Amino acid sequence: YLVNPAAYAAPGAYMFLLILVGFPVNFLTLYVTLEHKKLRTPLNYILLNLAVADLFMVLGGFTTTMYTSMHGYFVLGRLGCNLEGFFATLGGEIALWSLVVLAIERWIVVCKPISNFRFTEDHAIMGLAFSWVMALTCAVPPLVGWSRYIPEGMQCSCGVDYYTRAEGFNNESFVIYMFIVHFLIPLSNNFFCYGRLLCAVKEAAAAQQESETTQRAEREVSRMVVMMVVSFLMCWLPYASVAWYIFCNQGSEFGPIFMTLPAFFAKSSAIYNPLIYICMNKHVRHCMI
């Protein structure tokens, strides 16, 4: 045990709570949206993709982490570590790139850089495919030798190897690639899109270019998507910051809890997306009732 054996009860209980809430909420989001035709809009396809990503994390990652927490170390071997790390990374990355697609959609629809553009089903499908391709370019390489998945923190869950310069895995190049392509670029895109979005909403309100009903509907959707992006950053920014700090200070000593806390905090992202979707979308609430 890396810490007091009693301490493993906390992550185990936390994972149980995330599974208890995350599975039914995300499954309900999928079921209600697919069941009601009026909810099957192109924009909601991307939101459904978020629910699928969260279910990957819940079923492929959280269940494994809860089981290993009960034993006090990662008992499932190399294959189990690869599977847990892959599903957790894949789910987080699908969610990240889905939010990128949503940000671009909001920017194009509200700011109108392309005149007479409509976000159609074909655009949504392209967005889904894009999010999956980008997610796989991050989750697959550690399985085939570019970096690797290893137990992290208290050794109850697995993640990308930020910690070592193990020969033959090229960890340094993969971590730099991951931070640039899968963190800084999406982050910059979202800041740009929402910066332009806020300006456009204010300008439209001042000029009264559209009807009050249209403006209100666009504001509600934009507010929901912004909330999702902010919540995503709140969950994943601490993990990314700590991981980068460890990567830049390899060889220094870090306590197991130092990486465990932000890693487990990041896992809560599987809950907030469907809750925001449900709480801020009156059509979804009405269909559930």
Swiss-Prot record:
Record-annotated site: Plays an important role in the conformation switch to the active conformation: E84
Disulfide bonds: C81-C158
Bilayer topology: Multi-pass membrane protein
Modified residues annotated as N6-(retinylidene)lysine in this record: K267
Residues glycosylated per entry: N171
UniProt keyword annotations, A-Z: Cell projection, Chromophore, Disulfide bond, G-protein coupled receptor, Glycoprotein, Lipoprotein, Membrane, Palmitate, Phosphoprotein, Photoreceptor protein, Receptor, Retinal protein, Sensory transduction, Transducer, Transmembrane, Transmembrane helix, Vision
Residue stretches spanning the membrane: 8-32, 45-67, 82-104, 124-144, 174-195, 224-245, 258-279
Topology Extracellular: residue spans: 1-7, 68-81, 145-173, 246-257
PTM statement from Swiss-Prot or TrEMBL: Phosphorylated on some or all of the serine and threonine residues present in the C-terminal region. Contains one covalently linked retinal chromophore.
GO cellular component, one term: photoreceptor disc membrane
Residue intervals annotated with topology Cytoplasmic: 33-44, 105-123, 196-223, 280-289
Short motif ('Ionic lock' involved in activated form stabilization): ranges: 105-107
GO biological process terms, semicolon-separated: absorption of visible light; G protein-coupled opsin signaling pathway; visual perception
Subcellular location: Membrane; Cell projection, Cilium, Photoreceptor outer segment
Broad class of where this protein is predominantly found: membrane
Gene3D superfamilies in UniProt: Rhodopsin 7-helix transmembrane proteins
Cited InterPro entries: GPCR_opsins, GPCR_Rhodpsn, GPCR_Rhodpsn_7TM, Opsin, Retinal_BS, Rhodopsin
GO molecular function, one term: G protein-coupled photoreceptor activity
Function: Photoreceptor required for image-forming vision at low light intensity. While most salt water fish species use retinal as chromophore, most freshwater fish use 3-dehydroretinal, or a mixture of retinal and 3-dehydroretinal. Light-induced isomerization of 11-cis to all-trans retinal triggers a conformational change that activates signaling via G-proteins. Subsequent receptor phosphorylation mediates displacement of the bound G-protein alpha subunit by arrestin and terminates signaling.
Family: Belongs to the G-protein coupled receptor 1 family. Opsin subfamily.
Protein name per its UniProtKB record: Rhodopsin
Organism: Cottocomephorus grewingkii
Source organism phylogeny: Eukaryota, Metazoa, Chordata, Craniata, Vertebrata
